[in-house]
Amino acid sequence: MSTPLQGIKVLDFTGVQSGPSCTQMLAWFGADVIKIERPGVGDVTRHQLRDIPDIDALYFTMLNSNKRSIELNTKTAEGKEVMEKLIREADILVENFHPGAIDHMGFTWEHIQEINPRLIFGSIKGFDECSPYVNVKAYENVAQAAGGAASTTGFWDGPPLVSAAALGDSNTGMHLLIGLLAALLHREKTGRGQRVTMSMQDAVLNLCRVKLRDQQRLDKLGYLEEYPQYPNGTFGDAVPRGGNAGGGGQPGWILKCKGWETDPNAYIYFTIQEQNWENTCKAIGKPEWITDPAYSTAHARQPHIFDIFAEIEKYTVTIDKHEAVAYLTQFDIPCAPVLSMKEISLDPSLRQSGSVVEVEQPLRGKYLTVGCPMKFSAFTPDIKAAPLLGEHTAAVLQELGYSDDEIAAMKQNHAI
């Protein structure tokens, strides 16, 4: 089966989550991704949050499928020689080390261009070079705090909150992926590679663009009418936290369903659409609200929006969340059950679509991982298990022209 990135070779100098999520997607698209790891140690996530002693952790296996792994000590002369040969043959190099780490290995961007002017260099950092935080170590929640997500997440009477979704890590990897694919297309026109940099702060901010929109509206108006604080609360000079309110001008809220007292996920998310207000009133048994001036327009509803949600909840609390969604969908109401990770892991439709897949690694055995979220008509990514540490060292070195004796000598010299 032909794949989009067949024939593309990627050197993966990434660790933890932001970089590996990017290179994993490149591998799913058919690229030959060679993960370069420290001999005897490997990616730190191989050892983090283990559920089975002395076996690669799920943290690693779920971010590194379809890759090859080699152990390489780039501090040795032989290791540097191997690195240079790999760069000569590669199309893309991706790294997410702390600033300057690749340079200290002796492979500055200028030197890499001399070795292989067609190579595309992808780099993830916490902050842009011009940021006052450029030297701050950045992880998932650091990026959420600096990118605008934390200050706008949570309830108005509580502290900032970080999202459980990987807005700082995997989201940054997906942004870099887009940049690398664009650079590959650009290389077809120019014949040359380029450097593509992605800061975690920028990636989070890009997902918070509607909050930047709201900041400008707040600066001009002094209030934001779609937020729960309007019209009875007060607004400061920055976009506030709005709890579970909808952020697109269509009010929404989390509503209780049957069993909420004991099930922490017995809820649905319910959205009120202006154009669907009549159907909404019929669905909740309030047809008189259709023409009532106090309810008939979005502007009129906002002052008592929580009273409206409370009325709707009188119905949803009597039935199962799935029954509630099935009923409300008949009225074209945007809603969804709050699904737990347990429910998602067992969902047959997600298995059928390939969004959740089961793979097998020699030592770990079978485990679940996410599949490719994009669905293509011309090919289906074949999701494979993550590599064992150094599993492909000999094969990759042989492809570079090294003999078995030379490989044995490098191992003896701790270069691999």
UniProtKB/Swiss-Prot annotation:
Keywords: Transferase. Disruption phenotype: Cells lacking this gene show a reduced acid tolerance response (ATR) during the adaptation phase. However the deletion of YfdW has no effect on survival in oxalate-containing challenge medium. The active site is at D169. Pfam families: CoA_transf_3 (PF02515). Induction: By the acid response regulator EvgA. Involved in the catabolism of oxalate and in the adapatation to low pH via the induction of the oxalate-dependent acid tolerance response (ATR). Catalyzes the transfer of the CoA moiety from formyl-CoA to oxalate. It can also use succinate as an acceptor. Belongs to the CoA-transferase III family. Frc subfamily. This is Formyl-CoA:oxalate CoA-transferase. It comes from Escherichia coli (strain K12).
